[in-house]
């Protein structure tokens, strides 16, 4: 009597080892309305490999606007810029940092 005992578990949804798979983390660029015509642009979901302070400094210099980094419990570090800078931020992220457009989502009006 031969009994086959296979105690190994197989997870069909486990990582197959493909290095080509893109992370599911997207970068979200949003605009928020403030008083009257004033707006804020927020950038969240930047990869941790980038120094957010240096990115903020470059964005402020290139766009001639003020900005800050806000720490949120759920979202992590969020970059806030004054004004509607959505398109400019997307171009900066793709050209200067080499991120792909398909991983950047623009929200707003």
UniProtKB/Swiss-Prot annotation:
Show the InterPro entries listed in the entry: SUI1 (IPR001950), SUI1_dom_sf (IPR036877), SUI1_euk (IPR005874)
GO CC annotation:
cytosol; eukaryotic 43S preinitiation complex
Q: Name one GO biological process term.
A: cytoplasmic translational initiation
For this UniProt entry, the molecular function terms from Gene Ontology, in alphabetical order, are: ribosomal small subunit binding; RNA binding; translation initiation factor activity
Q: What SUPFAM superfamilies does the record point to?
A: eIF1-like
Coiled-coil intervals: none
Cross-referenced PROSITE patterns, in alphabetical order?
SUI1 (PS50296)
Question: Where is the segment annotated Disordered?
Answer: 1-22
For this protein, the record's Pfam families field holds:
SUI1
* Assigned keywords, A-Z: Protein biosynthesis, Translation regulation
Q: Which NCBIfam families match?
A: SUI1_MOF2
Chain's role: Additional factor that functions in concert with eIF-2 and the initiator tRNA in directing the ribosome to the proper start site of translation.
UniProt record similarity statement: Belongs to the SUI1 family.
The protein, known as: Protein translation factor sui1
Instruction: Provide the species name.
Output: Schizosaccharomyces pombe (strain 972 / ATCC 24843) (Fission yeast)
Query: What's the source species' lineage?
Result: Eukaryota, Fungi, Dikarya, Ascomycota, Taphrinomycotina
């Amino acid at each position: 009597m031969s009994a086959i005992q296979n105690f190994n578990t197989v997870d069909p949804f486990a990582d197959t080892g493909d290095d080509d798979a893109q992370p599911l983390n997207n970068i979200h660029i949003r605009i928020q309305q403030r008083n009257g015509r004033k707006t804020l642009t927020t950038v969240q979901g930047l990869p941790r490999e980038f120094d957010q302070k240096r990115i903020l400094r470059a964005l402020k210099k290139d766009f001639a606007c003020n900005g800050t980094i806000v720490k949120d419990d759920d979202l992590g570090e969020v970059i806030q810029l004054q004004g509607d800078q959505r398109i400019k931020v997307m171009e900066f992220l793709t050209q200067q940092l080499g991120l792909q457009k398909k991983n950047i989502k623009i929200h707003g009006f």
